[in-house]
Structures are given as C-alpha cells and as structure tokens.
Amino acid sequence: MEHNTDISTTQYNSHTVSTTTLSSFLVNVVTSSKRGNKMTTITAQPPRDEVEPAVPAPQLLSSDSASELSPKAEKFQPGWRFIAAFLSLCIIVLMAALDATSISVALPSMARALGGSAIEAFWAGTSFLLTSTIFQPVLGSFSHIFGRKSLIYISLVFFLAGSIIPAVANNFTTILVGRSIQGVGGGGIIALTEMVVVDTVPLRERGKWFSFFGMMWSFGTVAGPLIGGAFAQKVSWRWVFWINLPFLGIGTVLITVFLKLNQRHGEFLARLREVDWIGMVLFLGSTTGFLIPITWGGVQYPWDSWRTLVPLIVSAAGIVAFIVHQEKFAPHPLIRTSVFKNKSAALLYLTTVIHGIILWAILYFMPLYFEAVKGMGPIMAGVALFPWTFTVAPGAVATGIAIAVTGKYRWANWAGWFLATLGSGLLILLKPDTSTPAWIFLNLVGGIGTGILFPAMALAVQASASVKDQAYAANMFSFFRAFGQTLGVAIGGVVFQNQMKAKLLTYPLLADMADTYSKDAAGLVEIIKGMPAGLMKDQLKESYTDALKYIWIVATVLAGVSLVATLFIDEFDMDIEMDTERGFKEKSKVKDAEKETH
C-alpha cells in the first residue's frame, strides 16, 4: 500500500489512539486473585530459582479443609497513609488515561500544522501502544530487583520526557520519538501501579481497590477527548502534552511523601548482575519484530509483502530462543515460566489474549460504523461508544466487590464470557438503518460482559499462581491483554479487507474500486462522507456494514471459545495470607530471612 499523504485520513490514527485509552482503562481495572475451593489437590511447579525456597502451589480445597491447610489472611484495615498513597497512584493513572484519549481528537490538527501524512499520524498513536506493551514485562522484572517505587519514578521520567518532546516538536518524526518514549512510561505506570496493589492488598480485597483505577480510566476516557478537542480548537494542540506536567508534579510529590514500601537491600552492582540482559534483548527484539509487522500489515504494506512476512518469521524464531533461554540458561529469568505451568493459568492467559483481541477490534471498528454508516463526526462517534465505556467500569466495580464478598471468581468468568459472547453476537444485527435506541441496546450487553471480565480474569490469574509469583502473574496478565489488543486491530483489518472486497465485487457500480476501497477501513470513512446521496453511497454503506458484520462474527466465535475454556478453570482459595517483602511499611509483614532474587 502506497503512503497516502491525504491529511483527512489521519482519522485512522484518531481511532487507534482513542481505543488505546479505552483499552488502557480496561487494562487498569484489572488485577487481583489467589486460591479457591474444590475437592481435589494439585501441585504446580515451583520457581526454578535455587536461592528462593520453593513455594507451595495453590491448592484446590473444600471450604472446610481450606481453613485447616492454608494460613488465612487477616482482615485488611488500611490506614490514612495507605489511602493517601493509593490516591497518589490514582493521580498518575488518571494522567495516563487523559493523555491516551486526548491526543486522538488532536491528531488531525497536529497533522495539518506539521504537514504530516496519514501514515505518520497512524504511527504517532500506534508507537505508544507498541512500546507500552513490550516494556511492561521488562519494567516489571526490573521492579522485582530494584523496587517498585524506583521503577515508578523511572516510568514517570519517561512519561515526562515523552510529554515534552512532542510538545516542542516541529515535525512528526520528533512526535513519533516522543510518543514511543511516552509509551515506555505509560506501560510502566499501568504495570507498576497494579503490582503495588498486589504487594499491599490481600487477594480477596484487591478487586475493590482496582475498581478505583477503573474509575480513573473511565473519567479519562470521557474527559480526554473533550479536553483534547478544546485545546486543539481553542488554544493549541501542544497543550495536549503540556497538561501532563501538573499531574506528573503532583503525583511525584505525593508518591514521594506517602508511598512507603519495604525494599530489598543490597549492592547496586550485585543487583545489576541479577538482570537477565540476554533474555531482555531477546524478548524486546522478538516482540517488537512481531508486533510492528502485525501493526503495519494491510495499512502501510500488504500482508503478503516481504516487509511483513520476514520480520514475523524472524521474530517467531526469536521467541522460541527466548523461551529456551528462560527455561534452560537464565539464572534469573526475565519472566517466571512457573506462572504458566498449571492448567488454569494456561487457559486464563489464552482467554486474556482473546479478551484483548475482541475488545480492541470492537473499540476500533465500532466508531468507524458510526462515522461511515451513520455519518457522525469523531467526537460524536466517541460519544456513541458510551454504551460500552460507561458499562465497563460499573461492571468491573460491581464484580470486584462481589468477588471480595463471595471469595469466588469462576462464576464471574462464566457470566462475563457469556455476556461477551451474547453482546458480540448482537452486533451482527447492526444495519445501515438501525435506530438509535436499537444500537444503544445492542452495545450495552457486550460492555457489561467485558467489564465483568476485567477483575474476574485478573483475580483468577493471580489465584492460580503461588504466593510469591502473584506479582509476576499480574504483570504477565497486563502484557497479554495489551498483546491481544494489538492483534485485535490486525485481525479485524484482515477480515474487513477480505469481506469488503468480496461485497463490493457484487455491485457493478463499485466493482472497479473494490481493491482501493477495501484496503483502508478508516480512510474509506472520508470517501463515503464526501459522496453525494444516491445508490452508490447506499451500496457502499451496505458493503461497509456487511464487512464489519464478519468482524463481529469472529469476535463472537472467539468469545464462545473462551466461554468453553473457562469452564475448565479451577477455583482456588482466595483467603490466603500475604507473603511479600515489598508491602506497605505501615503494616509490614516482611520476612527478612526470605529475600527474593527477582
């Protein structure tokens, strides 16, 4: 596909970034869990590190025997200092949410001011998502060695640099560099704030606390586009980046004053030797080499281009090499493979990727339906997504509270995937002439289902891990969701291109343009809007709706697969005593004799 310099098609990136926000929101509502109830007992493989005592795997127990075999967590009673520290984390989460959403509506103004092309605008948004995804496991691993708070500071520095560079940029290349750096900081904020909660809040209570992060993302999702639009139209698009600085300043001060965590002690050089440098290079190189062609396939280059296929093949080999290195050679692995080595964990990580695929595909392509078929503008298309965005947060909050009360999470996974399957299926009913009340209802069910799944899957993932591995499990949960989100746009794009071309070929008036029109779902929005009313425009809208229908079908099938998969996850006991050396200093239960090496 040739590089298109038509500025109007920067709309493409607008959707990408706005979805990033929503996704991040979803990513942050997540995290928390531990063991459950059942009649059998299993033993998962302990961590391979000889320096750390093997930790017993989570046990499947009946309610009665659980009290006999598992140390129970004391009632969680946070003090004012903990609450203040948590609020400081909420501030930086809100900052990340506002940044991710506000840039979406400012991109057209940025492109016009700097003379950027559609491809450059596309990468300005996508680069943030890519670096945010691939650096989450790396920053999480570093935080096990150097401490959560230190890595939070480093993430804030990256976010600061990534805010200033685009704010003073005079070309899109500089903006691309800044957004990539900002993505590293954003990924760190997403991963590390969640890991702090895992370290400081008992498993059963975590869902309630993560719901506050969800509220921050919900507010950012709604307010971000309004703020970005106001800056772009009334002041300057550069203020979309400058506005981050007050949040960074306030958040940094409050974190310094109130976030007091227990830290490991040791020489800096000794800690550097614990870093899995080879694993880090293999991981970053392989995931970058995989995600970049997945992202530009069908947008910048055709899927059958060597520029797409060669990086995919090389990165696949790199991923295999990374896994072998982690299993056989790394004394201090970047990723603890023990978090994958039980049936429930494997199924849950699979469904986490699928959840990311479905969520991202719907949040990216649904606004295109509202714009191309319903004739809405970008901001109104975002408003039309409210049935999704406004139901995700309440669904997540209610589920987190319910799991805390019941101590069970399997029911929430089943309910969430049932509603997600039903909600995705209902989208198949969308037509060009679907009424407003109808499309609002059709979007509500899926929003509730995906909202339920955020805390449900996060808690289940952590419950399936040993006590010492829960922070690692939470980190990988965030990574796999972000990984799935990147795949979601790619899979949706392939489905759209194939179905759009097939449908256009059935209309004599549009057959000659089938190849051109089917290549760019977002760019086609402007073509449809610019057409005069008539048969050709009606047929193009019909084709567009029909192509999107197959994306909803794929989402429905994947959701159904996940529903079946979650029938086989186990219920682990969630009332387990915390055992962490990184707890909040106000109520520390650290065992000095057991120092982690990760």
Curated annotation (Swiss-Prot):
Compartment list: Membrane
Pfam families named among the record's database cross-references: MFS_1
Topology within the bilayer: Multi-pass membrane protein
Annotated SUPFAM superfamilies: MFS general substrate transporter
GO cellular component, one term: plasma membrane
InterPro entries on file: MFS (IPR011701), MFS_dom (IPR020846), MFS_trans_sf (IPR036259)
PROSITE patterns (alphabetical): MFS
Glycosylation: residue positions: 171, 342
Domain of life: Eukaryota
Main location: membrane
GO molecular function: transmembrane transporter activity
Transmembrane annotation, as ranges: 83-103, 122-142, 150-170, 183-203, 212-232, 239-259, 277-297, 309-329, 346-366, 383-403, 411-431, 439-459, 476-496, 550-570
Keywords, in A-Z order: Glycoprotein, Membrane, Transmembrane, Transmembrane helix, Transport
Family, per entry: Belongs to the major facilitator superfamily.
Functional summary from the UniProt entry: MFS transporter; part of the gene cluster that mediates the biosynthesis of squalestatin S1 (SQS1, also known as zaragozic acid A), a lead compound for the treatment of hyper-cholesterolemia by targeting squalene synthase (SS).
UniProt-recorded name of the protein: MFS transporter L2
UniProt gene name: L2
